């Protein structure tokens, strides 16, 4: 007994050979813990199953309401390449067939020769001028939207702006700008500014401001605040905290998002032309409405070429100036 007492005194955590009697209160608490832990574990296991079931149900309902049915999609797959197959077919075009045809025998004929490239692109000067206008619209709208997003993103950042009402108002403003589709904005702005590129530039610029502003706010909130705290501790103004504490960290991300948005705006400048907002899209709508399928095909080919070219150039710029893979 004395030896065990001495050992226990030397090591109070040492278990003695004799087991302590079981406490009924401890057993009840343990069983209660097991029940609650099991309930929590079952709830966590059930949560992803319920989430998947709800998402699947919503997907099925949306597919039924929009006629997005597997049978319909599968039936149309073989016809995806039909247009391009007829486009380059050597067979003569039937009057009832709306698909324009490029015939190899007349491919390099004159502007009066049907089924030739010159016949398709006889208005190439007009198309190139409108494409250049479309690119200018994208450049101007991106520059305006980028500048406004940079100016508004800092007051909308909770970690940088100490006045909650200002943060709330600026964030709601950015949400309104990006929530309205560009086509709707262009349609609204065509009324006061008339048909032309001005309405398209303003519509894309407003949407760009809202979209880039949200991304810039997220970059600001993830910035390291130690530099900002240091500038604040020595009496630096709010603008000095932004200029020297935040901008050096987030500026590469700003440029990357700006270049990506420029690629998107080139495509958007084409689409909003359908509501009279200028650019090549307005001409595309005209030739579609008159069923001039040769010109439709020519414009679509030019749009594809210019979009792919700009995407490649933008990727090279990101790789060169920001060090990101192209």
Regions found by a protein language model. Give the residues of each.
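Alpha-helical membrane-protein architecture signal
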Residues: 120, 124, 128, 132, ...
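Generic hydrophobic transmembrane alpha-helix motif, especially the helices
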Residues: 166, 171-205
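Hydrophobic positions within alpha-helical transmembrane segments of bacterial inner-membrane proteins
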Residues: 138, 142-150, 154, 158, ...
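Pore-lining and gate-forming transmembrane alpha-helices of multi-pass membrane transport proteins
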Residues: 133, 137, 273, 282, ...
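Membrane-cytosol interface at the C-terminal ends of specific transmembrane alpha-helices
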Residues: 191, 195-246, 252-261, 312-315
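N-terminal, non-cleaved signal-anchor transmembrane helix
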Residues: 1-143, 155, 159, 322-326
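Alpha-helical membrane-interface segments at transmembrane helix boundaries
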Residues: 128-136, 170-177, 259, 263, ...
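C-terminal transmembrane helix and the adjacent membrane-cytosol boundary/short C-terminal tail
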Residues: 297-326
